[in-house]
Swiss-Prot record:
Keywords: Ribonucleoprotein, Ribosomal protein, RNA-binding, rRNA-binding
A GO biological process held by the record: cytoplasmic translation
Binding partners and assembly: Part of the 50S ribosomal subunit.
PANTHER family, per the entry: 60S/50S RIBOSOMAL PROTEIN L6/L9, LARGE RIBOSOMAL SUBUNIT PROTEIN UL6M
Any one GO CC term of the record: cytosolic large ribosomal subunit
Function statement: This protein binds to the 23S rRNA, and is important in its secondary structure. It is located near the subunit interface in the base of the L7/L12 stalk, and near the tRNA binding site of the peptidyltransferase center.
Molecular function, one GO term: structural constituent of ribosome
Family according to the record: Belongs to the universal ribosomal protein uL6 family.
Name the UniProt record assigns to this protein: Large ribosomal subunit protein uL6
Lineage: Bacteria, Pseudomonadati, Pseudomonadota, Gammaproteobacteria, Enterobacterales
Length: 177
């Protein structure tokens, strides 16, 4: 059995937590995030920590409590420090630019690709082949990064495409004659 749920989530100074039944909202310097907690989980706020326990009558209570703890910990980190995700564009003529809340991509198609960013997410391009996404919500940042990568996934022969900065693309050998 995993023991993730047994560890409390420490609430740092400057973070405000509101528990209202199964709804929780966490507010910090980077914004406010809210989430509905699973019915199998009971969350208690004591001192500067959130504790988790399963409710009676649920088979997967500890599993849901561990998941809830991980999600709320990510919310606390998001509103205090925030999350970043870096993408790289590999390929001749592949470029990225940010205009307002729209990421413009040139990925070898006959048309440029414009991707609108959701609220709470900002993007910047330190160079034409790099995109840095920043925001408080870890799930939304990962989703936006996956959507940008899906326009041109790294191909296995030359490795061209949009990849995560820490991604290792395994390349295949070309066909022998």
């Amino acid at each position: 059995m995993s023991r993730v749920a047994k560890a409390p989530v420490v609430i740092p100074a400057g973070v405000e937590v509101k528990l209202n039944g199964q709804d929780i909202s966490i507010k910090g310097k980077n914004g406010e995030l809210s989430r509905k907690i699973h019915d199998a989980v009971e969350v208690k706020q004591a001192d500067n920590a959130l504790t988790f326990a399963p409710r009676e009558g649920f088979v997967d209570g500890w599993a849901q409590a561990g998941t809830t703890r991980a999600l709320l910990n990510a919310m606390v980190i998001g509103v205090t420090e925030g999350f970043t995700k870096k993408l790289q564009l590999v390929g001749v003529g592949y470029r990225a630019a940010v205009k307002g809340n729209v990421v413009n991509l040139s990925l070898g198609f006959s048309h440029p690709v414009d991707h609108a960013l959701p609220a709470g997410i900002t993007a910047e391009c330190p160079s034409q082949t790099e995109i840095v996404l920043k925001g408080a919500d870890k799930q939304v940042i990962g989703q936006v990064a996956a959507e940008l990568r899906a326009y041109r996934r790294p191909e296995p022969y030359k490795g061209k495409g949009v990849r995560y900065a820490d991604e290792v693309v395994r390349t295949k050998e070309a066909k022998k004659k």
